[in-house]
Amino acid sequence: MSQFSCVGLIGRLDSDNAAYSLRRLISFLAKQNIEVMLDEETAEFYTENELEIVSRETLAKRCDLIIVVGGDGSLLSAARAFAGKPVKLLGINRGRLGFLTDISPDEIEYKVGEVLAGKYVSESRFLLHSQLYRGEELISEAVALNDVVMHPGQFIRMIEFELYINDEFVYRQRSDGLIISSPTGATAYALSCGGPIMHPSLDAIVLVPMNPHTLSSRPIVVHGSSRIRLLIAKDNHLSPHITNDGQTHVVTKPGDEVVVTKSPDLLELIHPTDHNFYETCRSKLGWASHTGGC
């Protein structure tokens, strides 16, 4: 008997491979005596089904498990929609790296079957909450599972800004931008810019400069409860962009402030019982395997 009563499905929209895996998953779930629903955005591209098609808001209310078929980008989008909701997320990898979507396509029936039987490990991941202020006015706010990034947008020019942590001045910097990353995002964009790998269970945030003009500027790891504030210098000759998980963005103006804190809403992410963070790092990042001892 399944531990879950209703499963919601979300698929990558531009992938024939994802569509194939989604068909396999639907066929498997049809035999499990479980109510299954399909995300309405996915249904626009995947019409070969007789499932109930609903919004993500409805999925959050009626489902207790969401299965995402796609890459990490697909799961990032789902994470922002379902964080703080009483629903768990499981990922089937039809993307590239797959740090978050860790079930391979050839294991769908076996691994998903184990999860439905209650054989899984669950972990809570925190998200970042970003706010853009223009004077006293709140211009926009968003959440991100991986990272909040300040960057020049379409222009190749340096940004000048000041960094404050818990209202304490840290530095004034000229660089291509700054990556503010959660532990989940530490193996994504932050890693490619020289940031440290952090275990996802850590209550910490890492700030990674992008091509800083000062060689001594290095990534800083701060406590997860920190309030991070960026003051965009008024003499900037461009309007930096703030991007959340590489998927949503807002354009700032010189003199704006960006405040990033830990969101109170947690994401419940589940994995197969054999999930191991360090094994994932070895396989995804190409680390050397054990060869019999030193």
Swiss-Prot record:
UniProt-listed InterPro entries: ATP-NAD_kinase_N (IPR017438), ATP-NAD_kinase_PpnK-typ_C (IPR017437), NAD/diacylglycerol_kinase_sf (IPR016064), NADK (IPR002504)
Pfam families in the record: NAD_kinase, NAD_kinase_C
UniProt key word Cytoplasm: yes
Gene Ontology CC terms, in alphabetical order: cytoplasm
Record's keyword annotation contains ATP-binding: yes
UniProtKB keywords: ATP-binding, Cytoplasm, Kinase, NAD, NADP, Nucleotide-binding, Transferase
Enzyme class, broadest EC rank: transferase
Domain of life, per lineage: Bacteria
One GO BP annotation of this record: NAD metabolic process
Named cofactor requirement(s): a divalent metal cation
GO terms assigned for molecular function: ATP binding; metal ion binding; NAD binding; NAD+ kinase activity
Gene3D superfamilies xrefs: Probable inorganic polyphosphate/atp-NAD kinase, domain 1, Probable inorganic polyphosphate/atp-NAD kinase, domain 2
Reactions accelerated catalytically: NAD(+) + ATP = ADP + NADP(+) + H(+)
Positions of NAD(+) binding: 72-73, 146-147, 157, 174, 176, 187-192, 247
Protein's cellular compartments: Cytoplasm
Active site residues according to the UniProt entry: 72
Entry's EC annotation: 2.7.1.23
Its biological purpose: Involved in the regulation of the intracellular balance of NAD and NADP, and is a key enzyme in the biosynthesis of NADP. Catalyzes specifically the phosphorylation on 2'-hydroxyl of the adenosine moiety of NAD to yield NADP.
Protein family membership: Belongs to the NAD kinase family.
Identification of the protein by name: NAD kinase
Gene from which the chain derives: nadK
